[in-house]
């Protein structure tokens, strides 16, 4: 059994999603948003809120793995810089707890969860709800964070399967 904490970083709202993985089965443990605006409008206060929030989630859920979405360089470079700083606050909280960081692009996450890297937010929300058998549709940031965790779960499982096959090839037993 592996517990995965997924993070969808944002300088105002940072989504989080926690799942349990047993082989190729996923179970929902929790999700939501760290609202960084409540501590004030200045960026330093928001980053502190993100750091403290992620640290608390790590204490609460005791994840084995930590996965986070990479920064997308869009039209607004200032927004990308703030997003990078929000990611940094979350990553430092994870590394302070001894967790290894896995990073995935938005396209990789959508591909793993929906089957196409060009999926929209509604498709991601629908698939997260379906895969985790949730009673309702999760809020967008929480759904994205759960998708990050699911992506890591799929990636981690695939890597383990490939490693097992590589060992068999080395031993000359793959059929």
Curated annotation (Swiss-Prot):
This is Crossover junction endodeoxyribonuclease RuvC. The RuvA-RuvB-RuvC complex processes Holliday junction (HJ) DNA during genetic recombination and DNA repair. Endonuclease that resolves HJ intermediates. Cleaves cruciform DNA by making single-stranded nicks across the HJ at symmetrical positions within the homologous arms, yielding a 5'-phosphate and a 3'-hydroxyl group; requires a central core of homology in the junction. The consensus cleavage sequence is 5'-(A/T)TT(C/G)-3'. Cleavage occurs on the 3'-side of the TT dinucleotide at the point of strand exchange. It catalyses: Endonucleolytic cleavage at a junction such as a reciprocal single-stranded crossover between two homologous DNA duplexes (Holliday junction). It holds the Pfam family RuvC. One of its GO terms (biological process) is DNA recombination. The gene is ruvC. The lineage of its organism: Bacteria, Pseudomonadati, Pseudomonadota, Gammaproteobacteria, Alteromonadales. One of its GO terms (cellular component) is Holliday junction resolvase complex. NCBIfam families: ruvC.
